[in-house]
Amino acid sequence: MNGDDTFAKRPRDDAKASEKRSKAFDDIATYFSKKEWKKMKYSEKISYVYMKRNYKAMTKLGFKVTLPPFMCNKQATDFQGNDFDNDHNRRIQVEHPQMTFGRLHRIIPKIMPKKPAEDENDSKGVSEASGPQNDGKQLHPPGKANISEKINKRSGPKRGKHAWTHRLRERKQLVIYEEISDPEEDDE
């Protein structure tokens, strides 16, 4: 291995990196006046570059992200009269419609069907557990509603503090853990 070869490649890499950096800085400089840009330190400029890069990445993934504050001023001027067809962020928002909670709630089916409380107490399929541990025993008394029924009643139309509690479910079979001994320990 010749050490001179590794150092010979380094200036080209630095030139590419500085070219990318200057291109990114020029892109960010459009959001600020020349006076503001000259006052800024290098660390502030690079943080704005990363902020814009993160914003673009998140919008490409389809997330609804608030526009960074320094970019809001530029878009306000674009609304006043500039052509919007060249704005990359605008195209991304059009291509990826934002998913709201209401749409998501309609798309995802509910796990537990809603039934009146009388029907749930009469049906034994919900209150009984089949399996070797329980042998068909009831998990809760027939007169009382189980925990999942209470949660389902509370989370119906209210949808306030506990919006996702309707997804909780009660275990049908008890989980019993046993200690497994090693065969080597048994030999001793």
Swiss-Prot record:
The modification Phosphoserine is found at residue 123. Residues 1-22, 111-188 are annotated as: Disordered. Keywords: Cell projection, Chromosomal rearrangement, Cilium, Cytoplasm, Cytoskeleton, Flagellum, Phosphoprotein, Proto-oncogene, Transcription, Transcription regulation. One of its GO terms (molecular function) is transcription corepressor activity. One of its GO terms (cellular component) is cytoskeleton. Residues 179-188 have a biased composition (Acidic residues). Disulfide bonds: none annotated. It comes from the Eukaryota. Expressed at high level in the testis. Expressed at low level in thyroid. Not detected in tonsil, colon, lung, spleen, prostate, kidney, striated and smooth muscles. Detected in rhabdomyosarcoma and fibrosarcoma cell lines. Not detected in mesenchymal and epithelial cell lines. Expressed in testis. It is found in: Cytoplasm, Cytoskeleton, Flagellum axoneme. The keyword 4Fe-4S does not apply. The record marks 62-63 as: Breakpoint for translocation to form the SSXT-SSX1 fusion protein (rare). Residues 20-83 form the KRAB-related domain. It is linked to Spermatogenic failure, X-linked, 5: A male infertility disorder characterized by reduced progressive sperm motility and multiple morphologic sperm abnormalities, resulting in asthenoteratozoospermia. This is Protein SSX1. The lineage of its organism: Eukaryota, Metazoa, Chordata, Craniata, Vertebrata. The gene is SSX1.
